[in-house]
């Protein structure tokens, strides 16, 4: 199974990348090992979010654009109302990215 690299741009992903770069610069990590660590990060973060996150949100707004590239859906919505169990928030624009997950 392939995992998407979208979580590498999160705070956790960028911090990990910076730590790996520093370790490479000080010869504390073998060349190429950083790629293996990042691939494992992609796998672990995807699995953890799929299994452990149970919170739900409701979104209502106007769909501006949508696209599917490399099995990742991107939805851009305007004037969005976001609801969870305790609060309601309204924002001007939301961009959602989600990998397409198919189980056979």
Swiss-Prot record:
Main localization (coarse): nucleus
Subcellular location field: Nucleus
SUPFAM superfamilies assigned: Transcription factor IIA (TFIIA), alpha-helical domain, Transcription factor IIA (TFIIA), beta-barrel domain
InterPro entries assigned to the protein according to its UniProt record, in alphabetical order: TFIIA_a-hlx, TFIIA_b-brl, TFIIA_gsu, TFIIA_gsu_C, TFIIA_gsu_N
Pfam families, per the entry: TFIIA_gamma_C (PF02751), TFIIA_gamma_N (PF02268)
GO cellular component, one term: transcription factor TFIIA complex
Keywords, comma-separated and alphabetical: Nucleus, Transcription, Transcription regulation
GO terms of biological process kind: transcription initiation at RNA polymerase II promoter
Gene3D superfamilies the record matches: Transcription factor IIA (TFIIA), beta-barrel domain, Transcription factor IIA gamma subunit, alpha-helical domain
Function, in words: TFIIA is a component of the transcription machinery of RNA polymerase II and plays an important role in transcriptional activation. TFIIA in a complex with TBP mediates transcriptional activity.
Summary of subunit composition and partner proteins: TFIIA is a heterodimer of the large unprocessed subunit 1 and a small subunit gamma.
PANTHER family, per the entry: TRANSCRIPTION INITIATION FACTOR IIA SUBUNIT 2 (PTHR10966)
Family under the similarity heading: Belongs to the TFIIA subunit 2 family.
Name the UniProt record assigns to this protein: Transcription initiation factor IIA subunit 2
Source species of the chain: Schistosoma mansoni (Blood fluke)
């Amino acid at each position: 199974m392939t995992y998407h690299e979208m979580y590498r741009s999160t705070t956790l992903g960028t911090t990990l990348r910076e730590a790996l770069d520093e370790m490479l610069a000080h010869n504390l990590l073998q060349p190429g090992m950083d790629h293996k660590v990042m691939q494992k990060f992609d796998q672990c973060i995807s699995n953890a979010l799929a299994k452990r996150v149970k919170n739900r949100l409701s979104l209502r707004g106007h769909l501006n654009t949508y696209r599917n590239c490399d099995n990742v859906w991107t939805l851009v919505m305007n004037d969005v109302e976001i609801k969870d169990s305790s609060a309601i928030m309204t924002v001007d624009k939301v961009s959602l990215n989600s990998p397409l997950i198919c189980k056979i």
